[in-house]
Amino acid sequence: MSQKKYFYEKCEYFNEPHINLKYEDVLKMTLKEFEDWVAMFRRTVVDFWHETGAPPRIGVNEDEIVEQFSKLQSYQVDKFEEVDDAGEEIIYNFNKFATPVNQFFPAMYKTGIGGASYDKPKPSIYDIFCKDEYLPEFTKQMRRLTRQDGMYRFSKTIAKDDPAHHNSHLATGREWIEKWMAGDVLKGYDFCLSQTDSRVESLPISVSDVLQLYKAGSLEYKHISSLKSANWGDDMDSLVELPKQPIQIKVYPLGQKIFPEASAAFRIGMGSQAAVNFPPLTAKYLYQRFTEHIKTQDQINIYDPSSGWGGRILGAMSVDDRNIHYIGNDPNTENWIPELGISRYEYLADFFNTRTPGASNPFWGHKNTYEIYRTGSEIISNEPGFQRWRGKLDLVFTSPPYFDRERYSDDDSQSYKKFSNYENWRDGFLRPTLETAVEWLRNERYLLWNIADIKIGKIYYPLEQDSIDILTGLGLEYRGKIKMTMSPMTGLDLSNVKNSMQINGKYYKYEPIFCFWKP
């Protein structure tokens, strides 16, 4: 393996005190000082990104990557099997051991949302940092996530008559502030005033109360720098009542660093998001479960038509109780390493096989194999190397592109570019991809398809049903779906969201994995 590393490591600038500010210091900044800090942070990220290839993600160092990956082979994945409140089968996996796989695929942060069918495609995180046109909105989102604490990552509203909250029995917010200033404080905490949407009934305080306390010196700038109608503390003369956003008291522990929480400003705050990797341990679970009936076969050939961001190949390498040969495919040139003449998938798999004791030990290690193709899955049947696997695949499992939901790269070979409307994509990409998968699959084997409907504007695109119809039309038996539980998102009401479920009364979004059997 080359001495140069083709993965990024820990972004040390997140440890620098002038970058990773304390929350209370953010509240002390004037609005101009805060805007200057945002611009400086943005420049730091871009310079480091261009110099090292590392996106604005904290990450871990090489030794920690090896340590994390080394836990994958022995991890018992059958514990992921659960049922939701409706009694339906789910996969419940929030293990983070394999998260460093993302560090082998820095282009994840260059993936934008939306192709030609979107009226307003969303920028990639790379675009947000590198293009000046996004600076004003980026500054606004950083302010919302930090000074305003719009997602309540740093502070909590004082809830009226809640015994868990300091002095919540008092009648008014003014009385609460006056007692605090007289010395009745919560040790290790401070407070601020904010005008945000909140379902919590707090201690009432009026604009006139706030202005009087401010002019009397009872309130400092740090206490009022989250007030929206006062231009974030810079213009108290403009402070007015906002009926749907009453002034509330929020308390926060001192010493909190704003990162990683503030990264939500550029991960989701501007309508964009980093591409999401398929969880490697979930892939391992599916590989083991759906090849259990052929576990003792000399070699189990698993085909992944859209290899994505490496999660499924890492899952394949971590299976240690049977011999897996992973056959991956992806045309994304961002995942090619010209200096080595190999893809990032091969680089990742080789890293796992040579660096983790469970794979590299010559006496007791278990090492799986792989091969990678770099073409469209709709035309891979023309590849001479791939043709030798016709009728020899033991499992097909992938998560294909969701039409043009994500812009993985600007390559002309990307399906969202080759097929600009849904019908052409379905017939020109989805159908031939599935036809090849079915034809190349052995009898008495499974095909697993992780796909979900998408909504663009007011139009729903039926990716789920179209996939089912194509596969059953090709002779496969539909065996149902497994719900893959997704991480909960703060502040979202999922009760009426398609592909949501309840677990112990709490709503979660899920990704469906459709299961088919070739008789």
What annotation goes with each model-predicted range?
Residues M1-S70, S74-F80, D84-P519:
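Class I S-adenosyl-L-methionine-dependent methyltransferase catalytic core
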